[in-house]
Amino acid sequence: MLHQGIILREGHVTRTIYNLIKDKRYEDVIECITNIGEAANTRAGLSTLGHCYYHAQKYEEAATCYEQLCQLAPKEAKYRFYYAQSLYQAGIFAEALRVLKQISDQEEELREHCLQLQSAILYSSEDYAGAQSLLNQRAGGTADTLNDEGCLLYQADQHESAVQRFQAALQVGGFNPLVAYNVALAHFQRKQRAQALDYTSEIVERGVRNHPELGIGAQVDTDGSARSVGNPITMAMSGITQALNLKAALEYQDGNEEGAREALLDLPPRAESELDPVTLHNMALTDVQGPVAGLRKLAFLLQLGAPSCPKETFANILLICCRHELYETAADILAEHTDLTYKYLSQYLYELLDALITAQTSVELAEKKLGTLASSLAGKLRSLAAKVQEVRATNEQHALRDALKDYEQALELYLPVVMARAWISWRDDDFVGAEREFHSSAEFCSENAVWRLNAGHVLFMQGDKYNEAAAFYEPIVRQHSDDIMSVSAAVLANLCVSYIMTFQNEEAEELMRKVEKAEELKGNLGKQYHHLCIVNLVVGTLYCAKSNYEFGLTRIAHALEGGAGGRLYADTWLHVKRCILGLLTGMAKQNIILPYTAVQEVLGFLRSCEAYGLFTPANIFTATEQVPEEPLTIGLEARKLRLLLLKLSEYENC
């Protein structure tokens, strides 16, 4: 008998089947047995099929096989256990518990396994008290028991104790990538980044060494097409997926979205339909295609429901909506999923999101809600600050560490509320009102990097506080003097403008030279940065705003490489056309006279923009805006601006 290249000779069928199982070719075994016919209904055939379905992660099919075996051999308790185990993996928890209860307590060999499986089912069902009760009945000191104790401690937010249990499990049972991942996750919750990365790195290194067939770090074939390795059981047991997702979470938490994407790209290559929920969730958060694509993925996960849908999905889909000002969508999601609101949103997060959504219809009510929340958190911070001082006087290091942790956690909650209150004023161009909010929160937040950055922006936007703004920007630049490219281009541009506006031109030029030198160095390493481009654009726009169009437009043209480089796109073109339109308006009113040579330079610049931007979209559309069927391009807009400049300059020749 020949089956897809597998020769099943008479008298050697069993040997061939077991060799395939040894090679972990479970799908081939399943096809062979089901094609034999009568063998699929025998006890041996069903047992083999159940084993192969389970290891091929087809748990419902495995459960069906073991259910039939329970009927064929009702006295074999192991079949009931395998049946329950398959149901558990398939997420059918209630039925799994029912089957386990049918196994007699007299089955000593299975007692520990049954208790372990029951506690796992209750844990997955979020019945942590029930899981703890069963855990107390199990043999103590084993690797499995220590790991499960750690899981329950982790769930109770006792992360330090959880780390100790997980590490004890590793000592007793040797290295286990899934237990090592648990240690990393507990360190992650304790904000111990270095320790978490150590464990994830070890998991990945062992995975690369032991499982080259998974193609870790090789998302794409040499021909450029995606190559899927599927979801073999070895990938699940290697901890690779969990470790790289945690690494991505660490990078994302640090604000390094590119690093998070790189970590996800190192995952074994799979088709999107094959991705596990956690990977799909993290890819949604870092989707380069924008918020709409990410929201689609999160909405799909939300429809899956528990236990497949990660519990963070609901909060993240709402936060992404608010970040991209899709407030109506956020309100609809909250209204449609009231059950998830109470289950997955803390009272704090619900109140914050509710205030942001309310701000779209009633600013006064939103400010009142945020004010109440801010007052409550400020009171808590003062109380915790006093506690820290009291504990410091006792020299109890453990108590001091706990008190500082509580204070930092409260500060993490307070900061977004401060930003939300300032944002309400900011969006109405009430920068003085936003500054008042920063003054009122300085007591707690003045040392926070995010707070200082945004305080600098608020002062900068007022137009007469450039010295004060520079005082906030300068420490950020000094802190990253060894890698100035890691500083936001907006900060560098605003600091340059602040120097220019306070007659510190030498400092501005020195900063621009540093940026140019660093950008050239990074460019030689194959990395592309647009920091200098953005700085020149902002500085050029500033001079244009001061009616010095000759110098301002020269700066802008230099920033965009004369309009002939890869830096010409909708974002940068916006600065160009605003300044050109300002120039045209001034010329039309006869307030501005541009020298002949300057006009020729601007015309040449627009001609380059016309040629190189012929097919580049000229406008940016938000997630809620409909993109026209034939959107305007930079080339078309540049041609119109060039025509207007020719008319106003009374030139007939290009």
UniProtKB/Swiss-Prot annotation:
Superkingdom per UniProt: Eukaryota
CC terms in the record's Gene Ontology section: axonemal microtubule; cilium; intraciliary transport particle B
InterPro entries, A to Z: TPR-like_helical_dom_sf, TPR_2, TPR_rpt, TT30
Alphabetical list of SUPFAM superfamilies matching this protein: TPR-like (SSF48452)
Family: Belongs to the TTC30/dfy-1/fleer family.
Function: Required for polyglutamylation of axonemal tubulin in sensory cilia. Plays a role in anterograde intraflagellar transport (IFT), the process by which cilia precursors are transported from the base of the cilium to the site of their incorporation at the tip.
Pfam families named in the record: TPR_16, TPR_2
Annotated compartments: Cell projection, Cilium
GO molecular function, one term: intraciliary transport particle B binding
Alphabetically ordered keywords of this record: Cell projection, Cilium, Cilium biogenesis/degradation, Repeat, TPR repeat
Signal peptide range: none
GO BP, sorted A to Z: intraciliary transport; protein polyglutamylation
Organism: Drosophila pseudoobscura pseudoobscura
TPR repeat intervals: 10-43, 44-76, 143-176, 178-210, 384-417, 449-483, 533-566
Protein name in UniProt: Tetratricopeptide repeat protein 30 homolog
